[in-house]
């Protein structure tokens, strides 16, 4: 092979490699965003944590789908009192797991996942339209860099307890659910204590564990661009769903698939 033939062959080879790499990258972005650099460990335990304006039953569409795959599933009843107490409730459940465990959080409970996710049993983290602060970060200050979501105006307090109004819950929290379903969820929402919102994480488990994120593009409770920022910062494998804040209820198949991916 002469020099000209070698150069042509070499350049064609590079071009083929570049095209192949680009195709893989596009497929990855289309299905799961930027892949985490950390390897995924096979897990048989799933621990789910609910956020504000909800209780453990908010995972009821996802739980049977995970159980059908033979996974051991526990939904934590988040006390919604203070961040340390909420984290302790989660840790007690994690202590009971018998091996690698995927820790999943929705909404506010991303704070809990971020803090408790350093537990040795936790093999991967999944954030569902969830907060994902860095260690010691003021999440409120971070959120103020983005437009104020409409649901914020619907928070009302009875003394120390906060909840969403019916209008805000149906329109801004669970906007893509049938009205009857949204009203049933509104009826069982757990009130939260003001002190819960003042807590800061001391850990950032997503810096140590493989992380996955489901962005809700129609979210009116957490700004979707803030969700994208947090997902990108943690180098999470990311999906985007045309969903309200409660994608775990309106898109349970996609959320289940993301958790299964995290479980290896």
Residue positions per predicted region:
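Conserved serine/cysteine hydrolase catalytic core
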Residues: 193-234, 239-243, 248
